[in-house]
Amino acid sequence: MPTISQLIGSERKRLTRKTKSPALKSCPERRGVCTRVYTSTPKKPNSALRKVARVRLTSGFEVTAYIPGIGHNLQEHSVVLLRGGRVKDLPGVRYHIIRGTLDTAGVKDRRQSRSKYGAKAPKNN
C-alpha cells in the first residue's frame, strides 16, 4: 500500500492486459488464405493427428489455426474465416477456423452442436 507522499510523486499505474489473440487486432473474426494444410501431433499425454492450417490473415499476420470437426475440404489457397480460441494440447495454435463460411464446408452428417460446425439441419422424411 503506497503512502500519500508516494502517490503525490507518481500516480498509480493502470494494469495493461495482454491479448490472447493479437493477430485478430481487436476484431471478432478475420479472413485469411491457407498457405499450408497439415496434421500435427499433440503434447503428452495425448495422441492424435490434429488437422491444422497455416493462414495468412488480412491483418498481415501468418498464424496456425485449428480445423475443428471430422473431415474437411481445405487446401492451399482456400479462403477461410478465423476466430480466437486456443487448442490446449497444440502449442502455438491460438485460433480456430470457422466451419461453414467462405471456402470451408460444414461438417457432414452432424446431428448435435450443428451451429458450431456449420452443418445444415437434417432432412426428416
Swiss-Prot record:
* One example GO MF annotation: tRNA binding
Q: Which Pfam families match?
A: Ribosom_S12_S23 (PF00164)
Q: Which residues does this entry mark as bearing 3-methylthioaspartic acid? A: D89
Q: Where is this region: Disordered?
A: 1-28, 104-125
Q: Which residues form the signal peptide?
A: none
The record ties this protein, via SUPFAM superfamilies, to: Nucleic acid-binding proteins (SSF50249)
What is one term from the GO cellular component aspect held by the record? Answer: small ribosomal subunit
- Protein origin, superkingdom: Bacteria
Q: Which UniProt keywords apply?
A: Methylation, Ribonucleoprotein, Ribosomal protein, RNA-binding, rRNA-binding, tRNA-binding
Q: Name one GO biological process term.
A: translation
Q: Which InterPro entries match?
A: NA-bd_OB-fold (IPR012340), Ribosomal_uS12 (IPR006032), Ribosomal_uS12_bac (IPR005679)
Cited NCBIfam families: rpsL_bact (TIGR00981)
Report the family membership: Belongs to the universal ribosomal protein uS12 family.
Kindly give the PANTHER family that the UniProt entry links to this protein.
Answer: 30S RIBOSOMAL PROTEIN S12 FAMILY MEMBER (PTHR11652)
Q: How does it assemble?
A: Part of the 30S ribosomal subunit. Contacts proteins S8 and S17. May interact with IF1 in the 30S initiation complex.
Function, as annotated, reads: With S4 and S5 plays an important role in translational accuracy.
Please report the name of this protein according to its UniProt entry: Small ribosomal subunit protein uS12
Write down the species: Prochlorococcus marinus (strain MIT 9515)
